[in-house]
Amino acid sequence: MERFTQKKTSQERKYVLGEQEITQNPYGYTGAAVDRLGVFEDVFEDLIAAQERLAAQLEELRLQGKTKSYQFRELMGKKLVNSNVLSLLRTYGIQ
C-alpha cells in the first residue's frame, strides 16, 4: 500500500499529509487520502456490525444446544478473527 502520510517523529503518533493527496472544495475536503480514510471507516463499521450479528447467531445456536456443530465453530472462528483485528486497531488508538 502506498502511504499518504509521513510520521512527524518516531516517538509520536502524529502524521502529516502532502497537499497533493487532498483538495478543498465548498463541501469540505476530497482526494485519494480522504477516499482511503472513508473506506477504512466503512471497514471498521462493518467489523463492528459483523461482531454484533455473529454474537446473535452464536447465542441462537447456544439456545438450540448446537455448540458442537460445524456452524457454531465456524461462526466462533470468524468472531475471534474479527476480535483480533479490532484489538489490533485499539492498540493503535482506533476505537
Segments and roles (model prediction):
Residues 2-95:
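Extended, charge-rich alpha-helical interface modules
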